[in-house]
Amino acid sequence: MSRPNASAQKSFITQALKAERDVSSATSQRQALEAAIDAAEHYMKALNLASVQKDKHALDAKCKEWLTRAEKIKESKDWQAAARFHDKTVPEPRLPVSTRKLTTREEIILLEGAKLNGFIFPPWSTSPGSDEFKREDGESPFTDKPDLHLSYPQRKVFDGWKRPSELLAKDTEDVYTKVVPVMSVPGKTDLVQDMLTDCSVVASLCATTSMLERGQCTHFLPMIYPSRGSSQPSPSGKYIFRFYFNGCFRKVIIDDRLPSSKTSRSLHVIDRKNPNFLWPALVEKAYLKLRGGYDFPGSNSGTDLWVLTGWIPEQVFLHNDDVTGDQLWKRLYRSFHQGDVLLTIGTGELTEREQRELGLVSEHDYAILDMKESKGRRQLLVKNPWAGADTAPGDNGSLSASQDLPHNPPSFEPGTFWMDCEKLLQHFENLYLNWNPEIFKYREDVHFTWDLNNGRGVAGCFVNNPQFAVSTENGGIVWLLLGKHFRTTGQPERPLDEYQANEESAFISIYVFNADGKRVSLSDGALHRGPYVDSPNTLMRLEMPPRTTYTVVVSEQSLPSLNQNFTLSAFSTCPVRMAKAQDKYMCVRKIQGSWTPSTAGGNAESSRYPLNPQFRLEIENDTDVSLLLECPNTELATHVKLFWSNGNRVSRVRSRDIIADSGDYRRGGSLVEKKALEPGSYTIVCSTFAPDQLGRFTLWVSSLVPCKTSPLPPEAAGRRTVISDIGVLPPGRDRMLASLQVPRLTRIKLITRSRQSIIGSHPVGPSPVLMTVELGQGPYKQILATSEDGTHSDAVSGVRVEDFDLQPGLEESGGIWIVIERIGGPGGQVEDHFEVEALAEERVEIGEWILEDA
């Protein structure tokens, strides 16, 4: 079937289903007959376009069924019975279903998700039969316990839980007029909230009823039993809803008792046009049951519709630079009129002045009931679900300006108004889209637990984050939906602000990497990065090339430190697979360390860099290696280097010795990866940007084959430290020496450090120096040890004479001398100040500095 024919066939079927609902809600025999004939005619038109034999048989049967029913309505004395729908006449939605076999742990996660706010919501299995709602003679109506919680202001006007007939009798002034509750009504509805703070829920209900009224929905949303397709209430007062939350569709059972009020204010959603319309209040009660009670402050309508319908939620931040009216309109207009997307919208925080001038409510959700375009002008019909709303925003002029547009209603309900698309983008903050999952053919779900008490990573570091491989052979559109499972909100008397703080202070996001399904360590280099949202869901839309595997990372900010369950769902036009991301490296070692006052040496330009924590890495076979430095203090910028140093401590930084490093200093985590590292002993140095920055860190050493990693002791470990006086080389003098005495045979290391270099009063860089250890002086002196292989050096970390042995009693041979010789500065004008640190097994003595000519 061609695409235009398929679209037309769907339109005829949708109109036929709307006519079916009109039959059940008809108030006269003539209305019912006309609607039945209308249903038959639309099924006939759809049949003429059908090309699949199975569809032809089904549509032919529906056409004959409604011709027969029209005849019965016309001839029967009890036309209401003939007009009444049966549950089987309303088709179940054909949703994509995940076929992946769940693990035992995933099944446990779904069972854990059934317990919520003191109730049990089991996963949906099969549709309930009519026997479940029967009520025998003399049997009391079904009563669900315990009663839902009310807030303190609500309890002040609360007048008890009452059945719909009691509520309607109370609100009916004429005692001779009996108003009966119904589950469907003909024509338009006008749903509003009053005392409840659930604007997001009521806006969601307005969006779904509007879609039904436009005939753009092929099934009742949300799904309710026993009244799908019937206007008659449940005989027993029991209702079962099919809601999607905590990883699957679940069964939500309620009774029909609603909270009544002592005043004219209502404690539940009402239809101002049809006060006896029971369906909205029951949907609201069922939803509030799983969200903790009637004191629910509201979330956002995208989340609410996700639960009510199972339609895929997407949040669009209207003030983002990349969101334009043209792009948004083109994306939504056709889908909206095909019934494939529900639209709601929310304001941000507005001042009282802005609320007065704009006629909008701060941090409030609205429903979008219609979209239209005429003469280049794009408008949306917006409804405020609050009962006290004005007709329209005060100064946008949209009402008077839209009268010349086609199909404009002759009148508006209070709180309903047309608004230009560009003004809507300007005055509202968030647009919530809920997409019909039937637009996708394939789905795959993964359920998992994130232990945030022990497995929380630092910002920008993903080593502890849940990661998954998402692959597709054919490529195409793939949508990834991350859902955080609802948890019990707390004690019944919890403060409202505490409830909201728990809901709004935590954020989740999705990152996507082109990493072939292998785990990644840092957030850098993401192919796609989703925004951090305070909703329990976030959507990532992808276009995947054929034969591609992406790595998907779940990220969070400020979630409570406990076990949190999630579901990650992939929706696709082609088969898609999800699995846990594989570790790139087979062997992983985790080492704890810290920067202390004695080991916080700063970056490689600091003279104290060699004091930083260092580790020996020993490798016996060629291997790829990854070094990840993770620091929980996100104020510290960190860095990691890998040196060729034969496994010894690094005392000076030379570019020829650096094998790899992590690049710029980075907050949170630093990563260096080296492929095909040859066997040998190497040294790892972990540093912060500045000296004296203290903190803990974790070093993750990963490799393809086993390797050995061990901390290197500090340079002064097991040694006595002696520091000389400051020696000064004034201009024109380039050599000085000091005596060195040892009490017994000892091993010693010497380090010369510059303390100041000036020309006049202006600081300059130190002069390159050479340090030697000499036996005696004069023509017969003997050089025992030298620094830097006999070359002059101005290394910021100091000039070193590595370990050598000295014995006492050499005074008769001229004594032992530490000699510092420099290459003079420009014109011989530099004054250099140096000190020498001796690290020896025994305490040594360094004499006063003596100046000599070079």
Swiss-Prot record:
Descriptive protein name: Calpain-like protease palB/RIM13
Signal peptide interval: none
Organism of provenance: Aspergillus oryzae (strain ATCC 42149 / RIB 40) (Yellow koji mold)
Superkingdom, natural source: Eukaryota
Classification via SUPFAM superfamilies: Calpain large subunit, middle domain (domain III) (SSF49758), Cysteine proteinases (SSF54001), MIT domain (SSF116846)
MIT domain location: 2-83
Positions of the Calpain catalytic domain: 118-437
InterPro entries (UniProt xref): Calpain_cysteine_protease, Calpain_III, Calpain_III_sf, MIT_dom, MIT_dom_sf, PalB/RIM13_Calpain-like, Papain-like_cys_pep_sf, Peptidase_C2_calpain_cat
Protein family membership: Belongs to the peptidase C2 family. PalB/RIM13 subfamily.
Molecular function terms from GO: calcium-dependent cysteine-type endopeptidase activity
Keywords: Hydrolase, Protease, Thiol protease
Example GO biological process: proteolysis
Top EC class, one word: hydrolase
Enzyme Commission number(s) of this protein: 3.4.22.-
